[in-house]
Design a protein with these regions (language model features):
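Short amphipathic alpha-helical segments
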Residues: 60-63, 85-87, 134-135
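Short glycine-rich anion-binding loops that position phosphate/pyrophosphate groups of nucleotides
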Residues: 53-55, 77-79, 127
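A conserved segment at the C-terminal end of the G1
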Residues: 1
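A glycine- and Lys/Arg-enriched "phosphate-lid" helix/loop adjacent to the NTP-binding pocket
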Residues: 67-111
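ATP-dependent small-molecule kinase phosphotransfer cores
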Residues: 5-54, 59-66, 91, 104
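Hydrophobic/aromatic beta-strand patches that form the interior of the parallel beta-sheet core
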Residues: 4, 70-72, 120-122
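NTP-dependent small-molecule kinase module
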Residues: 44, 109-142
Length: 142
Protein backbone atom coordinates (compact mmCIF):
# COMPACT_ATOMS: atom_id res chain seq x y z
CA UNK A 1 0.00 0.00 0.00
CA UNK A 2 1.10 3.51 -0.80
CA UNK A 3 1.08 6.19 1.91
CA UNK A 4 0.06 9.67 0.79
CA UNK A 5 0.33 12.69 3.07
CA UNK A 6 -2.04 15.24 1.56
CA UNK A 7 -0.39 18.29 3.16
CA UNK A 8 3.06 17.19 1.97
CA UNK A 9 1.75 16.66 -1.55
CA UNK A 10 0.19 20.13 -1.66
CA UNK A 11 3.45 21.61 -0.35
CA UNK A 12 5.47 19.72 -2.97
CA UNK A 13 3.17 20.74 -5.83
CA UNK A 14 3.49 24.40 -4.82
CA UNK A 15 7.14 24.31 -3.75
CA UNK A 16 6.28 26.04 -0.47
CA UNK A 17 5.13 25.06 2.99
CA UNK A 18 1.55 25.41 4.18
CA UNK A 19 2.36 28.55 6.16
CA UNK A 20 3.53 30.26 2.95
CA UNK A 21 0.59 28.91 0.94
CA UNK A 22 -1.79 30.45 3.49
CA UNK A 23 0.12 33.75 3.43
CA UNK A 24 0.40 34.04 -0.36
CA UNK A 25 -2.74 32.30 -1.64
CA UNK A 26 -5.05 32.21 1.38
CA UNK A 27 -6.73 29.42 3.29
CA UNK A 28 -9.50 29.08 0.70
CA UNK A 29 -7.05 28.29 -2.10
CA UNK A 30 -5.21 25.81 0.12
CA UNK A 31 -8.49 24.02 0.96
CA UNK A 32 -9.37 23.92 -2.73
CA UNK A 33 -6.02 22.34 -3.64
CA UNK A 34 -6.14 19.95 -0.68
CA UNK A 35 -9.62 18.73 -1.61
CA UNK A 36 -8.88 18.41 -5.33
CA UNK A 37 -5.72 16.41 -4.67
CA UNK A 38 -7.46 14.09 -2.20
CA UNK A 39 -10.47 13.51 -4.48
CA UNK A 40 -8.20 12.68 -7.42
CA UNK A 41 -5.92 10.35 -5.46
CA UNK A 42 -8.88 8.60 -3.79
CA UNK A 43 -9.93 7.25 -7.20
CA UNK A 44 -7.04 4.80 -6.94
CA UNK A 45 -6.90 1.74 -4.69
CA UNK A 46 -4.69 0.42 -1.90
CA UNK A 47 -3.65 3.70 -0.35
CA UNK A 48 -3.29 5.07 3.13
CA UNK A 49 -3.95 8.80 3.44
CA UNK A 50 -2.79 11.20 6.10
CA UNK A 51 -4.99 14.26 5.92
CA UNK A 52 -5.04 17.51 7.75
CA UNK A 53 -8.01 18.27 9.95
CA UNK A 54 -9.53 20.63 7.40
CA UNK A 55 -10.23 17.88 4.87
CA UNK A 56 -13.68 17.42 6.44
CA UNK A 57 -14.69 20.94 5.39
CA UNK A 58 -15.39 19.61 1.88
CA UNK A 59 -18.55 17.50 1.55
CA UNK A 60 -17.10 15.35 -1.25
CA UNK A 61 -14.05 14.58 0.88
CA UNK A 62 -16.29 13.62 3.83
CA UNK A 63 -18.20 11.23 1.56
CA UNK A 64 -14.96 9.62 0.40
CA UNK A 65 -13.69 9.28 3.96
CA UNK A 66 -16.90 7.61 5.09
CA UNK A 67 -17.67 5.44 2.08
CA UNK A 68 -14.40 4.43 0.45
CA UNK A 69 -12.27 2.54 2.92
CA UNK A 70 -11.74 2.73 6.65
CA UNK A 71 -11.19 6.07 8.33
CA UNK A 72 -9.66 6.73 11.74
CA UNK A 73 -10.00 9.82 13.87
CA UNK A 74 -6.82 10.18 15.90
CA UNK A 75 -8.14 12.26 18.78
CA UNK A 76 -6.08 14.18 21.33
CA UNK A 77 -6.47 16.97 23.85
CA UNK A 78 -5.78 20.47 22.46
CA UNK A 79 -2.63 20.88 24.57
CA UNK A 80 -1.26 17.55 23.31
CA UNK A 81 -2.13 18.50 19.73
CA UNK A 82 -0.38 21.85 20.05
CA UNK A 83 2.78 20.19 21.37
CA UNK A 84 2.74 17.67 18.51
CA UNK A 85 2.10 20.34 15.89
CA UNK A 86 4.90 22.55 17.22
CA UNK A 87 7.33 19.63 17.12
CA UNK A 88 6.98 19.21 13.37
CA UNK A 89 6.13 22.57 11.81
CA UNK A 90 4.37 25.90 12.00
CA UNK A 91 0.70 25.69 11.14
CA UNK A 92 -1.15 28.88 10.28
CA UNK A 93 -4.30 28.14 12.26
CA UNK A 94 -2.31 27.73 15.48
CA UNK A 95 0.33 30.38 14.76
CA UNK A 96 -1.81 32.88 16.66
CA UNK A 97 -1.83 34.70 19.99
CA UNK A 98 -3.85 32.01 21.79
CA UNK A 99 -3.32 28.69 19.96
CA UNK A 100 -5.16 26.55 22.54
CA UNK A 101 -8.25 28.71 22.13
CA UNK A 102 -7.88 28.48 18.34
CA UNK A 103 -7.63 24.67 18.46
CA UNK A 104 -10.65 24.47 20.77
CA UNK A 105 -12.70 26.61 18.40
CA UNK A 106 -11.60 24.54 15.38
CA UNK A 107 -12.60 21.36 17.24
CA UNK A 108 -16.03 22.82 18.10
CA UNK A 109 -16.61 23.82 14.48
CA UNK A 110 -15.52 20.48 13.01
CA UNK A 111 -16.33 17.90 15.70
CA UNK A 112 -19.56 16.71 14.08
CA UNK A 113 -17.83 16.40 10.69
CA UNK A 114 -14.97 14.38 12.20
CA UNK A 115 -17.35 11.92 13.84
CA UNK A 116 -19.55 11.69 10.75
CA UNK A 117 -16.56 10.93 8.52
CA UNK A 118 -14.79 8.26 10.58
CA UNK A 119 -15.26 4.59 11.32
CA UNK A 120 -12.95 4.33 14.34
CA UNK A 121 -11.71 6.74 17.01
CA UNK A 122 -8.38 6.30 18.74
CA UNK A 123 -7.63 8.42 21.80
CA UNK A 124 -3.95 9.22 21.30
CA UNK A 125 -3.19 11.51 24.27
CA UNK A 126 -1.05 8.98 26.11
CA UNK A 127 0.01 6.77 23.21
CA UNK A 128 3.31 6.65 21.38
CA UNK A 129 3.35 6.49 17.59
CA UNK A 130 4.02 2.74 17.76
CA UNK A 131 1.06 2.25 20.09
CA UNK A 132 -1.22 4.19 17.75
CA UNK A 133 -0.04 2.06 14.83
CA UNK A 134 -0.70 -1.11 16.85
CA UNK A 135 -4.26 0.04 17.56
CA UNK A 136 -4.82 0.89 13.90
CA UNK A 137 -3.60 -2.53 12.82
CA UNK A 138 -5.79 -4.28 15.40
CA UNK A 139 -8.86 -2.43 14.19
CA UNK A 140 -8.27 -3.39 10.55
CA UNK A 141 -7.27 -6.95 11.52
CA UNK A 142 -3.77 -6.88 10.07
Amino acid sequence: MEHIDIDSEVEYANQMDIQNIFETMGEGKFREMESAFFIEKAKQHDQIFSTGGGIVLNDDCCDILKNKGTTFLLKADCKVLLNRINEISKRPLVDVKNPIESLSLIWEQREELYYKSCHHIIETDKLSIDEVVDELLQKVNI
